[in-house]
């Protein structure tokens, strides 16, 4: 059992692929997600597709650079290879045009840099169909 992880989450471990040419980005996201998810990182689409033949991911975090280079065809190919997969594209927070473009060609959502642990985990949990705890401050007067 994983330390600090609820028993139910340990049982329902989901598979997440992180695809980015940048090693630091891959490592950071794997570190953030590894407690609650079976997380694999890849520098190339081909490496991820090969691994995905035997171990289909539930969710893919995909560098915007891959999407810009290969366009909607890439998203279509990933969905064909892995039916039901959720595709989230990693974008820069200040790139509103890039975010709009990847959403227009079929991404399920975006994950924006800079990354913060709790927002990243909440977004991933939401797309994996897990209950997301709302933290609403209550003021008693």
Residue locations for each model-derived region?
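Conserved acidic segment of CheY-like receiver
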Residues: 12-24, 29-33, 59-61
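Acidic, metal-coordinating helix/loop segments flanking the phosphotransfer/catalytic sites
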Residues: 43-59, 63
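CheY-like receiver
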Residues: 2-12, 129-141
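C-terminal output helix
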Residues: 97, 115-124
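Alpha4 helix (beta4-alpha4-beta5 surface) of REC/receiver domains from two-component response regulators
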Residues: 73, 93-109
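Conserved phosphotransfer microenvironments
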Residues: 58-78
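Conserved phosphotransfer cores of two-component systems
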Residues: 53-55, 77-84, 105
């Amino acid at each position: 059992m994983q330390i600090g992880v609820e028993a139910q989450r340990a049982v329902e471990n989901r598979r997440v692929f992180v695809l980015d040419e940048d090693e630091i980005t891959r490592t950071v996201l794997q570190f953030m997600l590894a407690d609650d998810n079976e997380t694999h990182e890849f520098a190339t689409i081909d490496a991820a597709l090969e691994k995905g033949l035997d171990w289909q991911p539930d969710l893919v975090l995909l560098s915007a650079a891959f999407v810009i280079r290969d366009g909607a065809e890439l998203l279509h190919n990933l969905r064909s290879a892995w039916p039901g997969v959720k595709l989230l594209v990693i974008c820069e927070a200040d790139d509103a045009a890039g975010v709009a473009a990847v959403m227009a060609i079929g991404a399920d959502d975006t994950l924006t840099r800079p990354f913060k642990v709790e927002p990243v985990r909440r977004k991933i949990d939401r797309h994996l169909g897990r209950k997301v705890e709302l933290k609403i401050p209550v003021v008693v007067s």
